[in-house]
Amino acid sequence: MSRTSLIKLIHVARRELQLDDDTYRAFLMQKTGKISCRELTVTQLEQVLGAMKERGFKKQNKYPRRRFKGHVTPREKVYKIWQQMAEDGFITDGGDVALDKYVQRLTAKRNGGQGVSTLAWCHGDTLLTVLETLKQWHIRCIREAFSRHGLPLPVSPSGRELRGYDAMTAAYAHARKTRRMAQ
């Protein structure tokens, strides 16, 4: 690590360890015999940083490592939502045949009576329509479940009612996990 980077990191550590100027300079004097980072060699700077780490400083990455979630296709999302709805008890059959029948009924309305026979054949706008319609149905089921159990609909920290799919499903999962809602 370069000398400048070490000095910057030592100053970050000083802030995190909440060392006032006198304590910081006494600490440097004790470890190196000098009272300023400017006077220290790279080896001495590394020793000071090591001593600060022993006192509890933890270097944090500038860019925290994020877990790769991968790309999830809309078709995979439809399957997952369908399975989740079955697991939640909103639909009785979470299988592929039942999903294909749902897709056929839904797409028949758009195609003048002739629906797409299976989800695997849906592409583009048709697939997105199936996905968004299924999400809205799931949200309606969740709202009904909250109402049925006498629970208030979830709200954001600002007090506004949650409407987004991810927020609603997370609130429902939390309510089930905390046993506020029967499984």
Swiss-Prot record:
Its main location: host cell. InterPro entries: Phage_Mu_Gp16. GO terms for cellular component: host cell cytoplasm. It is found in: Host cytoplasm. Keywords: Early protein, Host cytoplasm, Host-virus interaction, Modulation of host cell cycle by virus. The keyword Ribonucleoprotein does not apply. It comes from the Viruses. It holds the Pfam family GemA. GO terms for biological process: symbiont-mediated perturbation of host cell cycle progression. Coiled coil: none annotated. The keyword Oxidoreductase does not apply. Induction: This protein is constitively expressed from the Pgem promoter unlike most other early proteins which are expressed under the control of the Pe promoter. Its expression seems to escape repression by repressor protein c and thus occurs throughout latency. Belongs to the mulikevirus gemA protein family. Early protein responsible for decreasing host DNA gyrase activity. Promotes DNA relaxation of bacterial host genome. Modulates the expression of various host genes probably controlled by supercoiling of their promoters. Host genes affected include DNA replication and cell division determinants. Homodimer. This is GemA protein. The lineage of its organism: Viruses, Duplodnaviria, Heunggongvirae, Uroviricota, Caudoviricetes.
